[in-house]
């Protein structure tokens, strides 16, 4: 059983994806940080561009106003892997977003599935 109990965190949704899903016409706060070099989070269609600075958390607000899928780019040359620094943002209407969100695992779901791993059960290591 998970030892650290946080009653307020059990319903947190755990997103494990390279894509960001957002609800249309709802303000969003983007937090950025970098552990290595300067990067830049850029979505041209949103007119949203912000540096990710090593050792600093930067942020900005925006509100998507058109549904669709948009490409996220790193707009700051950051090294040999720069060309591959891409992602996507999917902006959905309220109903589709609610459906997607309802399909995601919560922290409690994730812990329940990995209960043996959390308490150190060796059965997982034998598989």
Question: How would you label these PLM feature ranges?
Answer:
Residues 3-127:
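Non-transmembrane, membrane-proximal soluble domains of secreted or membrane proteins
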